[in-house]
């Protein structure tokens, strides 16, 4: 694929990040098909790398959304290398047209919320493997479901905030 085939590579990083998530999930499925088990000696390292990459892209998808929110709502005082949901919530809450979005981000960031779960998953993967013989987690269906939840979260926010939409924003 070349850049002209994929115009969203330049214009919509949220869609690109979701595309990357789907590719990493597809790679995990292919590893399982090829080796029969993600825990096998030959598959384990590849599977771990793809899982870590998938988790990073999931967090990156939300980060891209946060960058767009900062840009489109013209939030000032938030450093691009220190983007945190609480700072964005504070900036949005100060604008009359950002209160509803601030509430959605607040809910997502609370314990058990969608963004909190993505961060918790990443934090867990920093200290341990999601792949283990003891774990009852079947990672492929889990990540399929998590990716659906991520898409729904992004779509819900973009659909309800026209200022965040792009011509490519068909999630």
Predicted regions located by residue number:
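Acidic, Ser/Thr/Gly/Pro-rich intrinsically disordered interaction regions
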Residues: 1-56, 60, 64-171
């Amino acid at each position: 694929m070349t850049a002209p085939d994929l115009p969203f590579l330049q214009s919509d990083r949220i869609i690109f990040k979701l595309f990357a998530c789907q590719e990493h999930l597809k790679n995990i499925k292919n590893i399982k098909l090829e080796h029969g088990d993600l825990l096998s000696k030959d598959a384990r390292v590849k599977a771990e790398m793809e899982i870590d990459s998938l988790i990073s892209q999931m967090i990156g998808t939300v980060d891209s959304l946060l960058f767009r929110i900062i840009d489109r709502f013209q939030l000032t005082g938030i450093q691009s290398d220190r983007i945190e949901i609480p700072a964005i919530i504070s900036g949005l809450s100060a604008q009359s047209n950002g209160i509803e979005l601030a509430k959605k981000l607040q809910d997502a960031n609370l314990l058990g919320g969608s963004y909190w779960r993505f961060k918790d998953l990443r934090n867990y993967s920093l200290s341990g493997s999601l792949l283990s013989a003891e774990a009852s987690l079947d990672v492929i269906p889990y990540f399929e479901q998590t990716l659906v939840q991520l898409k729904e979260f992004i779509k819900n926010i973009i659909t309800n905030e026209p200022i965040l939409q792009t011509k490519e924003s068909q999630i």
